[in-house]
Every structure is written in C-alpha cells, then in structure tokens.
Amino acid sequence: MGENLLKEIEKGSKMAVMKKKIITHYIYNGSSTITDLAREMDLSVPTVTKFIDEMCEEGYINDYGKLETSGGRHPSLYGLNADSGYFVGVEVRQFSINLGLINFKGDVVQLKMNVPFKAKNTPESLDELCKLIKHFLQKVSVEKDKILNINVNLSGRVNPDLGYSYSIFNFDERPLTDVISEKVGGYRVSIDNDTRAMIYGEYMQGVVKGEKNIIFINVSWGLGMGIIIDGKIYKGKSGFSGEFEHNFGYENEIICHCGKKGCIETEVSGAALHRILLEHINNGENSIISNTKKNLEDLTLDDIIDAVNKEDLLCIELVEEIGVKLGRHVAGLINIFNPELVIIGGALSRTGDYLTQPITTAIRKYTLNLMNRDSVIVESKLKERAGIIGACMLSRSKLFE
C-alpha cells in the first residue's frame, strides 16, 4: 500500500505531490480537521475533502472520529493510518548498534538496543552490520513488503542526498545506500549523520516543545553538533554541517582523527576524557578505576561514566573540566546562531550535572547577555534513545519531505 504511493511520488504527478504534502502535515501535526488542513495548505475545503476521501480509501489516512466542540456540527479528525507502512532505523556506534521499527504514525513498534558490533572502515565490518540488519528484519512482526525504508546513522561526514559516507564505509565507489540495500535484500536505504538524527529524535519525540531554532551537542566518544533552523534540519550544501569539533581550538600538538592538529575534539570528547584519565592514573593519581580495572587497555567510556556516577573524584573533576571547555565553545555557537534551545546529549550527558553545570556556567560567562537570555540549556530527554528514535523518524520523513 505505502509502496504504491512512493512509486506515485517518484513519478512526480500532481496528485502524488499533494498527497505527500498531506502526509508531511500529519507527520508534524498528528491529527487535524479538513478545515484546518485546508487552511494550512491554502486550498479549498472541497479540494482537500476529495484528497482525504481518496487517501482514506487507499488506506493512508484514518478517520479518528468526531472532535468535541462547544456547539454546531462536530468535525471529524483525520490522521495517518499506522499500519499502512513501517520504517526501520539503525544507529551505528563505536562498539554497538541500535535498531528500531516505527509505524506510519511514528509509534515505536520495536527497539533492539546495544547489539555488539565494532565499527571499522572495512568491508568485513560493513558485511557484519548488514547481517545484523537482516537478522532484525527477519524477526520483526510486520509484513516485509510494508517496510518502506531503512535509515542508517553514521558518525562523521555523510551526504544524505547522494547516499555517500566519507568517514566510514567509504571504500566502494558506489553510494553506500546502494551497497547496503543490495546486502540487506533490496530494501530502500538512506543514510544520515548520527548527531543530526539525535536532534531530529528530540525534535519529534523528545525535549523540544515548539522551539524552531535548536542546537544539539553530542558529547560521546567524539563530539558533534546538529542544527535545526526555522523548524528544519540544517544540512549545508553537501550534508557536512555541524562539524564544529574540527575547528581549531588548542595548541596541543595532538593529531585529531581527521588528520589536523589541535581540533576542539582533541580536548573536548569522550576520547579526550579517556586519554586524560589514563595520563592521571599512570602518574599515580587515585581512582576507583585503578582498583576495579586490572587491564587499563580495556577501559571504556562506559567504565568512566560509571565511575563518575559512583562519585569517583578524579573522574568527576575531569568531566567538569571538559564541561568548562565545552561551555566556552558552545557560548561561541550561541553568539553565532542565537538558538532558543541548546540540548546536551550523547554518552557523556549521562554524567548529569557534573557535565551540564560547568557547561551552563561557562555559557553564562562567555555569551553576550542578550543572546544568553534567549537560549535555554537542557539535557536530552531521550538520552541513549535519541539516535535510534531519530533514525526511525528520518527513515519516514526522508520519503515525504
């Protein structure tokens, strides 16, 4: 059913384009009356009624029942039919992947979190990823022909429009989307940047409550930024926006994974925290990690976060130092973008106030007062689910926007 509409949209007929706009309206508004929809789309009520009747008959739209009003006729509410299509999201992280399935309305049907996987820029790693995706597809409880798209989140530079990744899985001349599609059984596939997916997840189902100008700071093993301007994800010309972590920040002679020296990420990231903590421990400073982790080569970011939340003083101090540094750089972003909302997310945000309070203090210190008054600093509501929820939501929105 949904596949038929997508084929219509690809042909570009006026009817299909109008149906696409109606679906997009319901993606962002949930439900509405025909009168409200006609006003929003600047069309006559009879024209919209014709489209809605046809889409109800085709199974894309449902009549949700009468809207309770104070008097007169009670208009009907319409919205998306949950069962007319499904969308898969895949979040690729450093040492695991998350997979999810949503229905046409955007309700989460299934999530599978923290599936072991090591992301490497090798054909073998890509093959393993595709095997995990295929296994998930085999286990989901929906008809396979109702799965309309699979969206994969990746870190680094991603061109979502062309389907190319430039930081990982970039060894094939073909678009990565084509390669993955071939390996998982011919499904439609899209890709996007991991932090853009996080901000979209928060925008659709998280902490965002009507704000239209938002920055999301992803502090995980690396560092990243997602941007929404006037209610739309900002990608830049080729999809590379948000790479502020590779701005020059420090005269430290540390070579970043991008190949340049002194990038912000070399001092402000989970990788930086990991490196600095090991330096302190090797210099003889005390930490519960020294007692619980016999082989420091196996130390993970999760181990450090657990130590912070167990009130390990050394780990707390180092997280706070990173918070101060990050706050200075975010202050600069606020001065540039003047956002309504700044969301702090990613793995390190699980340390809570130990990270966010120093960030907030530094922002107050280094932003212009007028800018500071406009911006609210909040923690991610979806936490570790932000990326996978965003991946699923992008899987849907990419087909209808």
Residue ranges and their predicted role:
Residues 87-91, 147-151, 214-218, 224-226:
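Short glycine-aspartate micro-motif
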Residues 101, 157-158, 227:
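Hydrophobic beta-strand positions
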